[in-house]
Amino acid sequence: MQLYFIRHAQSTNNAYWIQQDADNDLRRSPDPELTDLGCQQIGVLAKFLRSGSPDGGQITSGNNGGFGITHIYCSLMVRAVETGAAAAAELGLLLTAWADLHEVGGIYEVIPETEERIGLPGPNRAYFEERFPSLRLPESLNDKGWWSRPFEKPDDAVPRAERILNVLQDRHGGTDDRVAVVSHGGFFKMFLCQILGAPQLRNGWISMANTAISRINFHADWFDVAYVNRTDFIPPQVYTL
């Protein structure tokens, strides 16, 4: 299995945080949309997945005719669905939503006076069916919002990362599948540490730019991290963190 972890395109929250002003929590959306720049980024990403080289400048396969993605998953957060939908459409694939791929914390609002984080329902099945009719949804998604639980503490994301890795291995391990997952920067740190068998980085970060790609190859009894945070295909004018 070749695994391609892709961070979503720029969201409105990402754009606000670049400004680093005192009103960020007030303007923050629990489930932000993509910005106009983010919409440009997804077009660049989709075309690169279709016709770019998956090798990251390495001389490995000599493949310059696209990534050959066979399966594509995304979280149920709107910014990830929008990103994944553009890629899936360009590749002629069915996009499958996977709730566990969500960002650390889940869907929540911040109470400015106390900085308390309160979990929210999130969009329900009808919302996704209307807005993203070709998205394959989990059977468990109903008329209630897909989140509908308290704020997820960072420590609670660790077993979720393990669960994602185990499911990917069960579904695609030992095959030639090329799997793309469209997810989030905070969760990527958790997920990569899980793959490496490394302690979680309590006071550290692993950068992934918007629409950056990280590739991990899984073999019969070993794996290799081919690259992390690949951004060479993103034009400077649309590059964002």
Label the model's feature ranges.
Residues 1-3, 16, 21, 104-130, ...:
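Acidic, low-complexity terminal tails and accessory targeting/binding regions
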Residues 1-70, 85, 89-93, 220-241:
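An N-terminal RHG(E/S)-centered segment typical of histidine phosphatases
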Residues 2-6, 73, 177-183, 191:
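Beta-strand elements within well-structured catalytic alpha/beta cores of enzymes
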Residues 12, 16, 25-29, 33, ...:
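Phosphate-handling substructures
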Residues 43-136, 206:
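Phosphate-coordination/substrate-recognition cap region in phosphate-metabolizing enzymes
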Residues 86, 190-194:
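Active-site signature of alpha/beta-hydrolase-fold catalytic machinery across serine-
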Residues 157-173, 177-185:
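GST-like fold's C-terminal all-alpha helical module
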